[in-house]
């Protein structure tokens, strides 16, 4: 084996070498040529770099241009998509719905109406029974070639619809936001302060007559849902007469109806919009009112009991029926009404000043009546009520039925107010808590609308007023609610009003009617004429059965004397309770009868600790 050196220096046929060859380098030449080569290489590299940068810039520019173009295309596509969405959602969808309604609902209905019209016309031309030409459909589609005098009825119907629309628009703008449920002192857990505010600003005919010095008497005022109605007697005389022989005097019965609105002074005011003035007649002596559904209804008759006969009524018993819309129209009525006594047990009707309601096109009132079966059904109740320490009504001679030993029942009078309805008064009756005086009965609708509140006013220094419930369906029923006492030995349904002790308050000279307030819990107001102060006052008493609380506010009167009548009506307005009063007094100095009319606002605030 040869040594390594020999292996290194060995000759291989694949390595072409010249043995013993000597290479001589020219160092000077290398020193000159090397920088030039380096510069050339660097220049070439620089040019390559510039070229690469140029290529990159061109590509970047193209990419930016393409990106901008793509963004524009995307924006355009989005706009087109939104436009398509708008067309589908806001144009095509309602259009499809309209087409669907037309095809699926209206077209069949039109075919049905057309079929009905053809059928009605055939029936009209070939009637099998007497046709009612007062059908409102003939106002819309009158028959051809048939002469029918239907213009007046159609005009009345259109007038009532227009009045309803006007009333609703007026109440929406002026009264409805201000009227609400009464909830006086709801957050008070301790002492309270009651403050009052008086206002006599109004736009009523009674205000004009009072300003002229005319004598106003027997005023009744009722309110409801932003409306008011009233009736009264007024005596007019010629103020310009120079000689006493030329002075004339004429009495009238006046009916007013209107809305309650803000008159610019921060207090509610009555704004009369329609009225009726009739010369005083015997059948207009006593009137009872009902308000609702944009109209006022009244029944009036002579100041005497009405004798009822089964199936008919006497010719001498004239009942006047008046209907006024909040705005005057041809639908207003003033006519005589017939009394339908369909109950053979009814034999007497006793009407005083009563407040009714209007519901479902019908006016409703509650009044005392007498029945031939009173002793059979209520004789034991009266006997037990008068056994120990009999109340004053047991021996009363102030009211005809009590003096005759009769036991009055509750009668409900109804009259339909539709244009096609005849002015006929229907009567139904039923017994309930004993009726002990004839100071009137008032009806109010309860909060839930399932029943009515029936109130009787207090009897001066004798008995408290009562609040009963009245239900019409399925049959008439009157049940006690508050301020009545049960007579245990008198049977299951034997109740009498709460009578006061023998120690009467001599300072209380007169009591008013009892007013139910619109509230969830039963709240009511009554007033008394009080002479305990230097200035005589109307004292308002406010009761809340839900919280077992009561409040009072004395309103000082500018007049003084012996009271003749006191009538109030209350309604909520701007978080206050406002009560309208009509007070008639025989003046202590002159002996003449004077009146005071106005509205008192009552606000109850909590006293801070």
UniProtKB/Swiss-Prot annotation:
Mainly localized where? virion
User: Its membrane topology, per UniProt?
Assistant: Single-pass type II membrane protein
Chain coiled-coil ranges: none
Highest taxon of the source? Viruses
Could you list which ranges are Intravirion topological domains? 1-34
Q: Where, subcellularly, is it found? A: Virion membrane; Host membrane
Single GO molecular-function term?
host cell surface receptor binding
Which Gene Ontology BP terms does the record give?
A: symbiont entry into host cell; virion attachment to host cell
Q: Name one GO cellular component term.
A: membrane
Q: Where are the transmembrane segments?
A: 35-58
User: Which CDD domains does this one have?
Assistant: MV-h (cd15467)
Residues of this chain annotated as glycosylated in UniProt: 168, 187, 200, 215, 395
What InterPro entries does the annotation carry?
Hemagglutn/HN, MV-h_C, Sialidase_sf
User: Which keywords has UniProt assigned to this entry?
Assistant: Glycoprotein, Hemagglutinin, Host membrane, Host-virus interaction, Membrane, Signal-anchor, Transmembrane, Transmembrane helix, Viral attachment to host cell, Viral envelope protein, Virion, Virus entry into host cell
List the stretches on the Virion surface face of the membrane.
59-609
Function per UniProt: Attaches the virus to cell receptors and thereby initiating infection. Binding of H protein to the receptor induces a conformational change that allows the F protein to trigger virion/cell membranes fusion. Down-regulates human MCP/CD46 cell surface expression.
What the record says about family reads: Belongs to the paramyxoviruses hemagglutinin-neuraminidase family. Non-sialidase subfamily.
| UniProt protein name | Hemagglutinin glycoprotein
Q: Which gene encodes it?
A: H
């Amino acid at each position: 084996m040869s040594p390594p050196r020999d292996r290194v220096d060995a000759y291989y046929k694949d390595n072409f070498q010249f043995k013993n060859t000597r290479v001589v380098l020219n160092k000077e030449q290398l020193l000159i040529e090397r920088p030039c080569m380096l510069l050339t290489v660097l220049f070439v590299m620089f040019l390559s770099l510039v070229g690469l940068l140029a290529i990159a810039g061109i590509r970047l520019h193209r990419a930016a241009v393409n990106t901008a173009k793509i963004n524009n295309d995307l924006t355009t596509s989005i706009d087109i998509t939104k436009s398509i969405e708008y067309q589908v959602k806001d144009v095509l969808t309602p259009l499809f719905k309209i087409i669907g309604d037309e095809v699926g609902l209206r077209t069949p209905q039109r075919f049905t109406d057309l079929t009905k019209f053809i059928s009605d016309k055939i029936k009209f031309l070939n009637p099998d029974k007497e046709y009612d030409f007062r059908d409102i459909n003939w106002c819309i589609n009158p028959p051809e070639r048939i002469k029918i005098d239907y213009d007046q009825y159609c005009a009345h119907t259109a007038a009532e619809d227009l009045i309803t629309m006007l009333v609703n628009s007026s109440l929406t703008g002026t009264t409805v936001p201000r009227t609400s449920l009464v909830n006086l002192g709801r957050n008070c857990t301790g002492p309270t302060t009651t403050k009052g505010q008086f206002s006599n600003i109004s736009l009523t005919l009674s205000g004009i007559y009072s300003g002229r010095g005319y004598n106003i008497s027997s005023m009744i005022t009722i309110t409801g849902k932003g409306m008011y109605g009233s009736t009264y007697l007024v005596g007019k005389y010629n103020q310009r007469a120079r000689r006493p022989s030329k002075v004339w005097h004429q009495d009238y019965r006046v009916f007013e109806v209107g809305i309650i609105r803000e008159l610019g002074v921060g207090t509610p005011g009555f704004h009369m919009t329609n009225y009726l003035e009739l010369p005083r007649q015997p059948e207009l002596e006593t009137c009872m009112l009902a308000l609702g559904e944009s109209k006022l209804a009244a029944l009036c008759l002579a100041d005497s009991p009405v004798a009822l006969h089964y199936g008919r009524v006497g010719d001498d018993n004239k009942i006047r029926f008046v209907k006024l819309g909040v705005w005057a129209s041809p639908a207003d009525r003033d006519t005589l009404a017939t009394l339908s006594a369909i109950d053979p047990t009814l034999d007497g009707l006793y009407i005083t000043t009563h407040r009714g309601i209007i519901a479902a096109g019908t006016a409703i009132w509650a009044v005392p009546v007498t029945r031939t079966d009173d002793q059979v059904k209520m004789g034991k109740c009266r006997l037990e009520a008068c056994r120990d320490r009999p109340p004053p009504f047991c021996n009363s001679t102030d009211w005809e039925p009590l003096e005759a030993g009769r036991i009055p029942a509750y009668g409900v009078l109804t009259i339909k107010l539709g244009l096609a309805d005849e002015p006929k008064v229907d009567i139904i009756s039923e017994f309930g808590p004993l009726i002990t005086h004839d100071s009137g009965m008032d009806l109010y609708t309860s909060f839930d609308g399932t029943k009515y509140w029936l109130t009787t006013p207090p009897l001066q220094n004798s008995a408290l007023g009562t609040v009963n419930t009245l239900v019409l369906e399925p049959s008439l029923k009157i049940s006690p609610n508050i301020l009545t006492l049960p007579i245990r030995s008198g049977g299951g349904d034997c109740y009498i009003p709460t009578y006061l002790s023998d120690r009467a308050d001599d300072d209380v000279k007169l009591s008013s009617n009892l007013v139910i307030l619109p509230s969830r819990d039963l709240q009511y107001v009554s007033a008394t004429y009080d002479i305990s102060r230097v200035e005589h006052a109307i004292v308002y008493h406010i009761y809340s059965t839900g919280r077992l609380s009561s409040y009072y506010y004395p309103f000082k009167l500018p007049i003084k004397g012996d009271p003749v009548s006191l009538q109030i009506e209350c309604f909520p307005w701007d978080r206050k309770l406002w009560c309208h009063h009509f007070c008639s007094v025989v003046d202590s100095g002159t002996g003449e009868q004077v009146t005071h009319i106005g509205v008192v606002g009552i606000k109850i605030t909590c006293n801070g600790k």
